Amino acid sequence: ALSISGVALEQLEIHAPAVIDLLHQLNDTGCCEFLCEPYSHGLSSLANEDCFREEVLRQRDKMKQMFGKEPKVFRNSSLIYSDEIGGLVASMGFKGMLTEGAKHVLGWKSPHYVYHCNQAPSLKLLLRDFKLSDDISLRFSNSDWAEYPLFADKYINWIDVLPQEEQVINIFMELSALGMAQPLSSNILEFLKALPECARAKGITFSTPTEIVTKLKSVSQLDVPYPMSWVDEERDTSSWLGNVLQREAFNKLYSVAERVHLSDDRRIKQDWDYLQASNNFRFMTTKNTGIWLNRGIYDSPYDAFTNYMNILGDFIKRVNSLYPEDVDSEELNSLLTTIKNHGDEITELQKEVAKWQAKAEKETAAKKTAAKKVVVAKESVVKKEPTAKKSATKKTAESKKAVGRAKKT
């Protein structure tokens, strides 16, 4: 399965349409499933329910439009999950969700089973095996790793020796692992190409997330009162919201969420998506994890914070120019709702007028057709009359001749 944000798809459509063609080819195989995620790959699930719903539904529409199928399985940005988030996802009609098999949540349980959300039993949960996933995405080319070099047959053997009853092994990783975190010179692609054949030899099969949540039953509910993710040793959200800088930027961004949500300005909406991207906050982290962190164009978390706040300040000015700060949000919402309702009413009236116009045109056309038929019929009658008169005249003349003959006799 692949999960690609709406913002990423937009960029691919503009700058790398060949990649979109490849994605369509994958889709045509019927062996690749496209998942749903937040449109911006952001953190709205931690901040604002309305924003989260809006961008998830927008992403679902985008995926259906591009690939012809409505996603049934959801994965949040960086696999962020909690009981509350699971309930929201289930309420939008999703059947399954991917998340992290974090030790502090699972305890003695294994991630190799299907679980379900404790707020919505209909939402099945697929948990990442972080060891097997990170063996590929983080450790594959590390020559200091005890298992280096890793070959496909060895990797499949690790899976094969797991208990027979553990039927689901979920390997989730960032696509950047293939070529960036693990350079192509490490033969990472050759490793992946060899996996299916090695798996087949051991009787191990591959499935899409939807196939798993459809075929397998949940063994238990999963209790996650606080958000978890697949990032860092803590498997929490501290990588994005762990310091004062990050929380300041995050809170300021979502302070205008309601006004942006009410806006129909295309550029405002687009920049809102860009500003929500989770990496904006990840670049500001001051955590020392021992793992190399790509900070993008920034040399330090402070550079990232300064630049982001400058851009965010400009964005908020643009939002306030549309919807002034001195207008209460509830009052603004009420006014915009009234305008929208009037607009909807006008649209309905226009549809009604168009309907009556079409009906009137149809009736006029029918009357013209009927009038034409009557005219044609009259012409036919008129043309037949001379023949009738001739016949009558002939009969009268013959009668007169007969009478004349009778008189002579």
Short names for language-model regions:
Residues 1-28:
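Active-site beta->alpha N-cap acidic-glycine motif
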Residues 19-36, 69, 90-111, 115-127:
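Acidic, His- and aromatic-enriched active-site or binding-groove loops in soluble protein domains
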Residues 20-24, 53-60, 86, 156-159, ...:
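Generic structural signal for well-ordered alpha-helices
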Residues 42-65, 122, 127-163, 182-185, ...:
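Alpha-helical scaffold elements lining the catalytic groove of polysaccharide deacetylases
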Residues 57-112, 178-192:
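Catalytic domains of cell-wall/extracellular-matrix polysaccharide-remodeling enzymes
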Residues 113-114, 119-123, 142, 160-358:
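Active-site and substrate-binding clefts of carbohydrate-active enzymes
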Residues 358-409:
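Intrinsically disordered, polybasic Lys/Arg-rich low-complexity tracts
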